[in-house]
Amino acid sequence: MDKLTPSQWKVINKSYEPASTIKVIAGPGSGKTLTLLYKVLHLITVENIKPEEILIFSLTNKAVDSIIENLLSIFENSHTNKEIVHQIGCYTVHGLANRIVVENEGMINIIEEIGWRGLMKLLPPSKRTPHHFRSYKELEKVVKDYKLNNAKNNNPVIEKLVELMDNCKVMTNDDLIIRAKKYLELDSSDSDASSFTQDLRNKYKVVLIDEFQDLYPSLAPLITMICKGKQLIMFGDTNQSIYGFLGSNNEIMSQLDNLHPKNSTTVLKLFDNFRSTPEIISLASKIINRPLAEKQIIDDTDETPSELVRKLPSGVSPQIMTFDDLAAESEFIIDKITQLICSSAKFSDIAILSRTNSHLTAIASILKKYGIPYQKLKSQPDWMDDLRIQFLLDILKVCSLASDEKHNREFNTGDKWQSNFSILVTMSALKGIGDASIQALYKACSLKNLSIWKYLTMVPNFEWPLGLSIKKKMENYTSNLYEMIENDQVHQLDDPMELLEKVASITNNLNLNPTYFQSLSDAQSSLEFKTHLQEMAQVMKVSKSNKPPGISFVKWFLETYFDQTMVFHQSQQALQTTGPGTVKLSTIHSAKGLEFPIVFLTNGSMSNFPMDTNALYVGITRARNLLYMCNMKHERLVSKSSPYSRNIMSNNLFWTYYNKDLKRSVCDVKVTHGYNVQRYNQLRKNFGFYRAYSSLRGCKSVFRRI
């Protein structure tokens, strides 16, 4: 068992009580996640809480993956059957909401970028009207505001779009939360209620929330309903709250703090720091203006200073620098990575964090030029964000939904055709299909109370209100999908690869508008698409392996691919290999809950915006041993470091400290120093770093040889 601190044991040993709250205030690197994991172990092995009575919430898929992986390790190390970990409910809030709604409604659409683009095709073209939008982001905001105001703002165009979304079961993430709450509110004695929904009401006894500071108001209705009457255990740090743009964290925390009586609420604190060096902690404390006096620590906790865990000083302070342009900043980062790799660091030790994805994209292109392997970290898998993959999913939805609807032609259900949305989205991506054609077709379908698919396959084409060239494109669309829908082939194909090949073949024949997606002519973009397609195929195979009887494969996959992606990622954890790895690129928001031995924190030389205090604090506290800060604009930061220092190369004491901290061998640090310097000098000569300043040039991938 891991060596736990007195403050951690206080949390772990706090006994189970129904309708109670334990709030654990835990700073970065305080062992919060480890405490949560051992609390779960304690509940099962000591408190006799069944694993299926425990529910864990986090906000990101990466955090859920990490919790499950670490639970498996802890249960195995404690000689407890690790298979019971899979009986514990561990979800993102939206993942759980999605499962509730799908279980009660069947297939739904969570609207993504490609969906908003499709909806924009239905908007009138006049720029003089109040419903003209320059981007799908503007439309998304207006629709959200319309729903929040309960349709009080008189806008018939938005009203029609929202009606279409409702009829086609198209939901935003906020809609998902509201809809899930509605099903939890239903009478549990209702015989039609689904078992998972009943379990959330009745089975779970303990709910643990990881990173409570990341919660925002729209999540409150669902979370408070689930947690009421159970033991609620929350872990978090208000200094790391960086989702203020989604609403005030204080609002939802006030509801959770008052969920149970005050005499049933306990607040505990973790002040240890297992992660960052004292030098990094000192800078982080300065940023949030928190004094480090031991008196404050003693006042806030029962531990004495000698009981609190702190790492020894490393002797290396964070470096704070300012650069005039991206070239100078990037050259510094490349040069410093060269020094670090030529010492004792691995690529996998290094993370480059920024506030924006656009700045990370610029840095990624430069890393690629130098042959430095990198990986972008995101809140959800890349394949699910790829517009081309989203299009394939929408084609599958068209086929599945339209095939189901053709059996109901005798029923006059008006405009409530769920396939309409996916058809509009996929048609919007076809070359030569403009807004006017989409609007004319949709209006004609509405007048006849037919779905778009039924209209195109039942109404003679001479009645279509479309030009000849557009009619041909529509006929090509229907002819390519006809066999899948009208012959029910989509529900008969049971092999994931056959289904994917069929959908890919259909897509290839549809004459897509290349400007609707990322350019497929670019080699890197094509390679990314191939990678994402392979991952989608793997998730489909996972879905096939656990498909229950009585449901077609395509329907099962489309209803559960969010959950199946989680299963796939968990299975991949055990397959990770050792080696130099990759440099991690991430926004500060996506790096929440993660740590890295070495962090480059960059804001971009062209950014005139000061860094938000909490975001800067989160970025700083991701670093374990080394921190380099580039163009960080903040009132409590002063740029004072020289970007041309090579001192880290010769600091044997630090590299001994570094390798001990990461539990690596330290015997070769001194012996190989001379060779490392020689290797670095050769690399910097190749790259042009021997000058005080140089512009970036096309370089060979020299790093692949080291």
Swiss-Prot record:
Coiled-coil blocks: none
Catalytic activity: Couples ATP hydrolysis with the unwinding of duplex DNA by translocating in the 3'-5' direction; ATP + H2O = ADP + phosphate + H(+)
EC number: 5.6.2.4
Residues noted as binding ATP in the record, renumbered to the chain: 29-34, 275
Membrane topology of this protein: Peripheral membrane protein
PROSITE patterns assigned: UVRD_HELICASE_ATP_BIND, UVRD_HELICASE_CTER
Entry keyword Magnesium: yes
Enzyme class: isomerase
A GO term, aspect molecular function: ATP hydrolysis activity
Propeptide stretch(es), residue numbers: 693-706
SUPFAM superfamilies given in the database record: P-loop containing nucleoside triphosphate hydrolases
Superkingdom of source: Eukaryota
Annotated signal peptide: none
Subcellular location: Mitochondrion inner membrane
Keywords: ATP-binding, DNA damage, DNA repair, DNA-binding, Helicase, Hydrolase, Isomerase, Magnesium, Membrane, Mitochondrion, Mitochondrion inner membrane, Nucleotide-binding
Occurrences of domain UvrD-like helicase C-terminal (ranges): 278-593
Record's GO cellular component terms: mitochondrial inner membrane; mitochondrial matrix; mitochondrion; nucleus
Needed co-factor(s): Mg(2+)
GO terms under biological process: mitochondrial DNA metabolic process; mitochondrial genome maintenance; recombinational repair
Domain UvrD-like helicase ATP-binding: 5-277
Main localisation: mitochondrion
Reported function: Required for mitochondrial genome maintenance and mitochondrial DNA inheritance.
Protein family (similarity comment): Belongs to the helicase family. UvrD subfamily.
The name this protein goes by in its record: ATP-dependent DNA helicase HMI1, mitochondrial
Organism: Saccharomyces cerevisiae (strain ATCC 204508 / S288c) (Baker's yeast)
